[in-house]
Amino acid sequence: RNVDQKKIFQFDDCTPNIKPLLSELRKKSQSIMIKASPMIDLSKGLLDLGPVAEIHIISVRNECKEIVFILNNESYTPPTLYCVNLDSLHPPLQGNLTEEKSLSIEYCMPKNIILDPNTSILKAGLFKTIGHHYGLSKIAINTHFFTSEEKLKEFPGRQFEVIGPLNKKNIKKLLPAGKANVITKNYPLSAGELKSRWGLTDGGNYFILGFRNQENEAQCWLTKKID
């Protein structure tokens, strides 16, 4: 935060501004660690800092808390991204954006399980990397839910068992108590707006996942979270 207690996240807005100091710091140190705001855009951070060896994206209980850039006197292209979610059983994931761009992934409708990666992985943008690592398909290019036939023994995020598509014709039958938890991604309504539209209250064991599929159709699916 600045002197007015406003949140800042660009290096240019910080005191001291690290950018004009980097040249001298690189002369005096083999390795430099820079802790940045979790709100920073990683691409902009890389442009500002020059050669970066590693980026550590650190979440605690699925809330991104720290972005740490590791610089040294060698040139790394691209840097390795390390994604961790502390105070959880989530395994770490690492990758880099060059490999991410080179990978391919299948897009398809939900299978038996829908998977939601943790915040660190979403911040890193390692979408095809996690799909490739765990053998997953993705719902759509801009919908960051994944899907598989079976539950994974370990996964850095949440897993949901699919019950089926949900709409205004079957919602009262499937949710007679009118209670559900709602998550929306790449969907025209927020979670709160969707709950209001269907007259739902928070709670219960069911999760409604709202998203757009690869054909850009807005859909809702009823699921149960797997513990």
Which residues make up each language-model segment?
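SAM-dependent transferase fold signal centered on methyltransferase-like domains
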Residues: R1-D227
